[in-house]
Design a protein with these regions (language model features):
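C-terminal and inter-domain tail/linker signature
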Residues: 1-141
Length: 141
């Protein structure tokens, strides 16, 4: 994929996260693609990826994910271990079951490997989990 094609792909991917339909997110992944969050156990396959996306959508019914920027190399430089770095921001109110109604705004990135069908073969997502937990309890302030 060219950088222009990847940028369009990234914009559509962010829109899928805003759709409240987890299958829309999973459709960006290869059939056996994987998604991990903060070095956790990867969700493998579209059904498992949809489950992860659905969890965020369930917890944040008003969730908005914005596409911030795209890079072609890893954040730490050197030989690229990925095809692209997708930077994003999530804003939403934790009003799902068990939620405390607090507004959350976090940013992070995903390291993408893209397959020959131009789908995500692997994504390793990262965000500041301590700040996320703090906002879940206390909100943005």
């Amino acid at each position: 994929m060219t950088l222009t094609e990847l940028t369009r792909f990234a914009k559509r991917y962010a829109e899928a996260w805003c759709s409240q339909n987890p299958e829309n997110v999973a459709a960006f992944f290869a059939e056996s693609g994987s998604l991990s969050v903060n070095d956790g156990t990867p969700a493998v396959g579209r059904a498992a990826i949809a489950e992860i996306a659905g969890g965020f959508m369930h917890d944040f019914p008003d969730m908005t994910v914005t596409f911030d920027k795209l890079e072609r190399s890893t954040p730490h430089g050197g030989r690229s271990a990925c095809d692209a770095v997708f930077h994003w921001s999530l804003t939403g109110t934790n009003t799902g079951p068990g939620g405390m109604g607090k507004r959350v705004r976090i940013s992070g990135y995903e390291l993408w490997k893209i397959d020959n069908k131009e789908l995500i073969a692997g994504s390793k997502g990262h965000f500041d989990s301590a700040e996320y937990e703090r906002q879940l309890k206390h909100g943005l302030d």
